[in-house]
């Protein structure tokens, strides 16, 4: 299951003992919906090696500004609470898997 993040739990949830993948999305974005389906599947396959979360930047504008989100979907790849990589737009699952491997 992918955790929904808000300003209240964001900083705690991105500090995991494994790589963290955060999808920054909006509710009316078709590309975001497609990517969410991909991430749901990947989160089940990789639940022991990566932590998946998402954040609606329509409602969490502080997070949108903090990470300078200008397009959605945006994926943040985080290790030790620090963003190590960012991908924008629809992304192939293999690219996401490779970026997770780089964080280990």
Per-range role (PLM):
Residues 59-62, 94:
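Short loop/turn elements that flank and shape the SAM/SAH-binding pocket of Class I
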Residues 1-12:
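N-terminal "domain-start" segment that seeds a small globular fold
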Residues 24-38:
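Conserved redox-active cysteine motifs that mediate thiol-disulfide chemistry
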Residues 79-104:
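Non-catalytic, surface beta->alpha helical segment in thiol-disulfide oxidoreductase systems
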Residues 16-19, 36-55:
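Conserved helix-turn-beta segment immediately C-terminal to the redox Cys motif
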Residues 61, 67-76:
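Structural micro-motif
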Residues 15-27:
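Short active-site neighborhood of thiol/selenol oxidoreductases, capturing the structured segment around
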Residues 12-13, 63-66, 99:
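CheY-like receiver
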């Amino acid at each position: 299951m992918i955790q929904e993040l808000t300003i209240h739990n964001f900083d705690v949830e991105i500090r995991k003992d494994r790589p963290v993948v955060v999808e920054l999305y909006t509710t009316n974005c078709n590309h975001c919906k497609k990517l969410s389906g991909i991430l749901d599947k990947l989160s089940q396959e990789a639940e022991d090696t990566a932590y998946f979360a998402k954040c609606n930047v329509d409602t969490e504008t502080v997070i949108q500004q903090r990470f300078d989100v200008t397009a959605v979907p945006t994926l943040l790849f985080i290790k030790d609470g620090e963003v190590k990589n960012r991908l924008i737009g629809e992304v192939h699952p293999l690219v996401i898997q490779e970026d997770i491997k780089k964080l280990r």
